[in-house]
Amino acid sequence: MENEEVQNVSDTGDFPAYDAEAIETKWQRVWEEQNLYKTEEDSSRPKKYVLEMFPYPSGDLHMGHARNYTIGDAMARQARMRGFDVLHPMGFDAFGLPAENAAIKHNTQPSVWTHKNIDQAVKTMFRMGFAYDKDRMFNTCDPEYYKWGQWIFLKMLEKGLVYRATSPVNWCPNDKTVLANEQVVNGKCWRCGAVPEKRELSQWYLRITDYAQELLDDLDQLEGWPERVRAMQANWIGRSEGAEIDFTLADTDGVTPTDTKMTVFTTRADTIYGCTFMLLPPESKLAAELVEDSEYKAAFDALHEEAVKVSSIDRQGTDREKHGVFTGRYAINPVTGQTVPIWVADYVLLDYGTGAVMGVPSGDKRDFDFAKKYDLPIVPIICEEGTDIYEELKGVSEYKVTSVDWDGPMDTVGILVQSGPFTGLRGGKHSEAEEAVVAYLTEHNVGRRTVQFRLRDWLISRQRYWGNPIPMIHCDCCGDVPVPYDQLPVTLPDNLDLAAGDTLAECKEFVETTCPKCGKPAKRITDTMDTFTCSSWYYLRYCDPHNTELPFSKESVDRWMPVDNYIGGIEHAILHLLYSRFFTKVLRDLGMIDIDEPFKNLMTQGMVKDEHGDTMSKSKGNVVPPSSVIEPYGADTMRLAILFVAPPEKDFDWDEKVVAGANRFIKRAWRVVWELSRTADASAVFDHTTLDAKSLELNRVLNAMGIRCTTEFDKGQFNTAISAVMELVNAASAYINEVPVESRDAALCYKVANDVVAMLAPIIPHWAEELSHEALGKNIPVYHQPWPEFDPEQAKSNTVEIAVQLKGKVRARIEVSADASEEELTAAATEAIADQLEGKEIRKVIVVKGRLVNIVA
């Protein structure tokens, strides 16, 4: 462990040995009895809301959790010492599929399984010494919490942000439920890794797309977020500026226009003369209608059956072989007037743009591969000046070349050729050619400038039991009817035998009800909500967790929000963080809060890996539980090791040597503080101007390292903050070894001991509490003690090291007084290299104060 060269302090002092288990057990009991970490609600202090992403209680906590929570705990403790009124809560994201599957496996109820795990996790949290306000702790599976999730759902319904639709959805064959687009990661289910299928289902959605532009624009406000996370969200929202173009479906004769429009979205309207075919996705209803009762239907059905088994990401891969089916029908290009064949292709997705695509094989790799495979025309329409094909087609406005043989699509930026009146214009995104084509489309009412987003509405329906019930009732007479507010919460039945295959839909006691509108028999909706709806507003409930009238009061949220420091893994960059931002904006528009964004500063901590660099996971059996460190070394050792081993945002490999090193430092610092306390006098007046040389140097290190520790703490760089304290402990140890007890400055000894304890208190609080009370005689909890202040002037060294050069080359380095005159510097430098100056005449001396003396001889 770095900086372990702490000099050994004599063990002959009359002070107790460090006993981690006894000390930690003692103070955890005291903190519990005093309810020390209850939020004070002191409006005279500035507020600081520190929050770690709450865990899913699938079992006991692991070292990844420990790192996350230790970072937040250190922030919260230091903020309290810096004079802030701190809100530092914790809870559990308790609904979800793993608990349901585990309950089935163990033949028990999800609620029983979940609460058992929560009880164990809470014990582990408090054994690690985390300063959570236990009075604000809740679980999202508690009816007192999820009632308000249902309440918010109904408010969104009233605002027009909730709707039900039948559409192709991602179906996980393993988990037997649907997945939102965001939950398909790299073509697989985010939770189990299975490849989703496409199914047509009636599902409930939230209109997150209504906030797409604001979600994108407000990323600029998030200066305290990592740029990587902001970029990931911007990419997922995926704003594209382009145009919609209305192609007309030709009748079965392939020529006569019909009233049916096929609208495409493109960012490259300037390439419309290169469109040689139209593409529809296999899921398209129009495609199914076009091939109905035709010779192409069997091939279409086969393509559809295979396409829905492949993930969207894989279907769009540029290197994947393309598959298509001709529909036998044609569309009319609104600019050229020519007809182009309509094909169905598996690389086209229903949820991109309008769902229809114009195929431009000379400008797109996938279109090019498709055209080559099915022998479709490839029309060069954009060329870079100076190329052979440009020289051949320069100024040609009508089609001259409709089939070329090259390795791939041509340039996407260049001069338009074979493009009618637009020939000769420079093409590209936002180019003069693109502007001219869009102007033509708009003028002739066959197209328009528009913006599309990759983001799709949030599908929240889940076909599983262990989730927040959607508070809707279906009546054959009235349709879908919301559950009245005074009937919330809709609670889950606890008598299902999940192991036997029971489902909510089969539970008569749950399903059968009466319509709130007409009073006739009706049925409850049996879908539950995506668990991310529970975690998208929990940070607001912490502000007012016992409110029985509302999810939270506006006054409480005005006091605490936004969260000042939010800590969690980067794997939540899109799902949780995007959804939370959406909920915040909706609740703002409902008049419940005034903020635009929920999290001011975001820290995405790195992962904890095993000694081989592999990610820890239960399935691999390489998880290190906190107890494996706490039992032999203590919680403080674990906390120190976690914070010291690497910057918070970096991954690190778990190493027992780091733990052992952390424990050695704790014991050495323990001895140093006790040894200083032998001379320390809290009542003595400290005056740095009266200190002798050794005391003055220790005081300088105290202030220099104190300033560094404070600065690094404020930046969240705990490893370098700890290094600064280690240097101070080194200096204090040297002072103890070199200065007899009777010669030590009593006020300085107290100040150093006190400040070492204070600076380490957020990191190793049990150790600090014991020393504060027993060694320093304080009766105030360290959590309530002030963070020490340091003086930059006293941090300055009285001496500086300067280089001595002879003819520009460094020959020596000397320690001199910081305010030495040029004459004194010259004399000291000359003496330092006297042997090298023998027989030489000094012709010139150049002095740069504080840096060097250059002698020319």
Language-model features: where?
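Residue patterns forming the tRNA-binding/recognition surfaces of aminoacyl-tRNA synthetases
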Residues: 2-8, 12, 17, 25-26, ...
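Amphipathic alpha-helical
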Residues: 209-239, 281, 285-325, 488-514, ...
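Helix-rich, typically C-terminal accessory recognition domains appended to large enzymatic cores
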Residues: 93, 158-171, 239, 449-478, ...
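Basic, alpha-helical terminal appendages of large translation-related enzymes
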Residues: 1-45, 281-284, 294-298, 377-388, ...
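Conserved oxyanion/phosphate-binding beta-strand-loop segments in alpha/beta enzyme cores
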Residues: 3-4, 8-51, 80-89, 112-120, ...
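Catalytic alpha/beta core of large soluble enzyme barrels
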Residues: 72, 85, 287-385, 390, ...
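N-terminal catalytic cores of NTP/NDP-binding nucleotidyl/phosphoryl-transfer enzymes
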Residues: 40-108, 138-152, 266-267, 334-370, ...
